[in-house]
Amino acid sequence: MATAPNILLFLTDDHAQWAMGCAGNSELRTPTFDYLAQNGTRFANAFTPIPVCSPARACLHTGRLASQHGLHDYLNSNDPAVNSIHWLENETTLAQLFQAAGYQTGQFGKWHLGQDEHAAAGYDEWFSLGRDYPIPHEGPFRYGVNGRFQTLPGRISHNITEHAAQFLRARDAERPFFMTVGYYATHSPWQGQSERLAASYRNATFADVPQNETYPFGRQALESLNETRHNPREALAQYYAAVTEIDTAVGRLIDELESLGQLENTIIIYTADHGLNTGHHGIWGKGNGTLPLNMVEESIRVPLIWYDGRSASADVPLPQIRTEFVDHLDTFLTILDVAGIAPPDKNYVGRTYQRLLHNQTIPEWRAVQFGEYGNVRMLRTSRHKLVYRYPDGPNELFDLAADPREMNNIINREDMQTIVQAFIERLEGFFTRYEDPAKSGLRVRDLPRHNSSEAWRTS
């Protein structure tokens, strides 16, 4: 096990794919992310299988669709009925697989998959955000620490980072580690960020964020209805500050790895549970930022960067920017693959893309991305996107080449009907092949309630 690679997986909340310097944002300061991308592999077409917190996290941790693991919306951890359910009870997670392979495991930051104060199966060390939602960005705040609550002062990002660093310093040097770190600063409320950082962005032009867009296919919801819309420039300054704060925190852990002599044997993966709109399409939020639920690009795209500390001695030309479609389900299998751990015998949707990390091609890699959110399902190709809402719509088809801002729904156009029918058949064939009928998003009204605001019960 001495030569097995360490794995450091960052799963940030609400970090939009567009919100990085290395992804083309001209004003955001993200030197750590830019360094990882410059010395690693960035995926320009990385997606979430479902654009909302808890189920997206479940997808990455289990490698399974929401319609397989059965978690379809964000969990209201303050609700005793919701918190009493073992949502991933019958699933096998990355942590369980790495622990069984002899790895020392730790989770730090946001978990949001139920019973957050207790260490989830597979984790040796546990430091999670507590159940006091909404979460402020600065304490005092309750954390779940190895089965008990502990209230700590200070900024949440700082506390997550320091406990993760303590784990690195105290770990068994004879064993490799697998650790997950979930930063939260980019989540609403978009206020209360570091004043120093927020002030540094208040004079920004925010030219990379579309201005004055409207959403013609539904009404605004959740974050879209709060005070953010009354002062969007300040909200953007706060969001940019949050991204820079997280960038600094990630850099702090990289420095810790380097000081411990572990960076050269560590694989770092940085991603987010889902994307985010900060005025894009007139929306503030993700898939549940509108009613009906949306699948706009900014909601479904996620950042994804792989950095392999061993690459300095490998014949891999860097940096790489890959344009293949990948998602959390693929990333689950790839993380196992790079560590040499076999996945369980389950009906996994994804494929390992380890060869892409080595600048190789993978024959017959898919040219389509599927998604879901409750009774909403999506099929996206490089040219078109179908959003299909069961059982009665409204449904959408977009030509992403001609209409990249997704403003013109062409689903009823006569010349599109062949494409529409082919997409519907492919969408239904995909879910018929993979979904668990007992946990399907098409029967969410019959499944346990996740929160009191589920779109399928309130819209």
Regions found by a protein language model. Give the residues of each.
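Long, internal low-complexity/basic segments
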Residues: 1-5, 12, 16-17, 42, ...
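C-terminal, low-complexity/hydrophilic appendages and adjacent surface loops
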Residues: 296-297, 307-309, 369-412, 447-459
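Short, solvent-exposed turn/loop segments enriched in Gly/Ser/Thr/Pro and often Arg
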Residues: 22-24, 41-64, 72, 107-119, ...
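Histidine-centered active-site microenvironments of extracellular/periplasmic hydrolases
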Residues: 28, 119-122, 129, 191-194, ...
